[in-house]
């Protein structure tokens, strides 16, 4: 049956995924803690913007075209989460004012790319389904996931590109 112009068809979105290892690393950047509603209202994007303004002040940056957006569970019973905007460093010799250093353990990750024009929710649904289909589950860690953002991308872009990395273990 033909569809009218008012009906929308569901577009298939593919996010090819794979398993990768990431060695432990040290990072320096900014910390944010808040609710999912605050994050949805843009407070993380504002923090990312502040981070990018201060990026050049971080010594010993490991060369990369990306910065990390790392999310952790908040304290038990809390209504939100903790998010860091950081860059990997070769060593911590000095920490710029208002920033901190963070140690990220060596973990196994499921990885996929979210591209412009895709639904962010669908990208996360796709990688979650892929993890299950491969016989993995989310790892029991405080770190829930991280995203790799291009340094040249505007944090306020309504159509961002980034890489999703979710810690996993065999089910």
Locate each region found by the language model.
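A solvent-exposed interaction/effector surface
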Residues: 1-171
